[in-house]
C-alpha cells in the first residue's frame, strides 16, 4: 500500500511545480511560499481531524517532536530555494536538479538509517546524476538567460535541504501518526516562511499579488498538501531509499505540463537526460 501512496505523492508533487510556476510570474517567490503554506497547513489539520489523530498530540515524545521541527525547518529552506529557482529559471531545468536530491537522500539513508545499497541502486544513482547533468545543459529561455546561473544555486540548495527533509522526516514520522506529523511540521514551515517575508521586507508586496496568481498559489498549496500526506504515509510504512525515488517520478508530470502550459520544449540532449533520470529512478526500486 505504501507504494501507492508514494506514486500519489509523485502525481501531486508534479502538479505542484506547474501550479506554483503559474503563481509566481509576478508575485515574489518568498511571499508566494508564505501564502501557500497557509493552505497546506489548513489542509493538513483538516486531515488530522478527519482521521481523529489530534487525540495523540499529547503522546508525542520530545525526540519525535524535535525531528519533526528540524524536518519542517529543512522543508522551509528547501521551499524558499525551490520557488526562487522556479521564478528565475526554466522549470525543465530546475526540477531535475531538485529531484537529484534522491541521490543524497539514499546516501544519507544508508549512513544514518542503515538501509541497504544494492548494485541496482548504485547504478541508478549514476544514471540519475548523469541525467540531471544532461537536463541542466538545456538551452536557456530568454527570461532564464537574464537571470544567469543563479537559479542553479537555488535549485541545488533546494535539493540539499529536500534530502535532509526526507531523513529527518523519516526519523520523526516513525513515532507519530503520519497526518499529525505532517501537520506539526507544516506549522514550523509556516512560521519560518512568514518570518522570511517580514525579515526581508517583503510584507508590503502582499497587497500587490494578482488575483489570478493567488488562485494558482492556493491550488499549488492544495497539491502540496496532498503530496505531503501521501509522501509521509509512504515514508512511515516504507524504506526512505525506495519512497524517495518513486516520489521523484513527479518529474514526468511536471515536464508534461510545462510543455502543455509554458511551451517549454526538451532538446535531444535533455530528453536523453530525462530517460536516464527515469531509468535511474526505476533501478532504485529493484
Where are the regions a protein language model picked out?
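Juxtamembrane helix-loop boundary signature in multi-pass membrane transporters
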Residues: 1-8, 103-160, 267-286
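Hydrophobic/small/kink-forming positions within alpha-helical transmembrane segments
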Residues: 10, 14, 18, 45, ...
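A helix-boundary/kink motif common to multi-pass secondary transporters
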Residues: 28-29, 90, 113, 117, ...
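Alpha-helical transmembrane segments of compact multi-pass small-molecule transporters, enriched
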Residues: 38-43, 97-111, 188-192, 246-260, ...
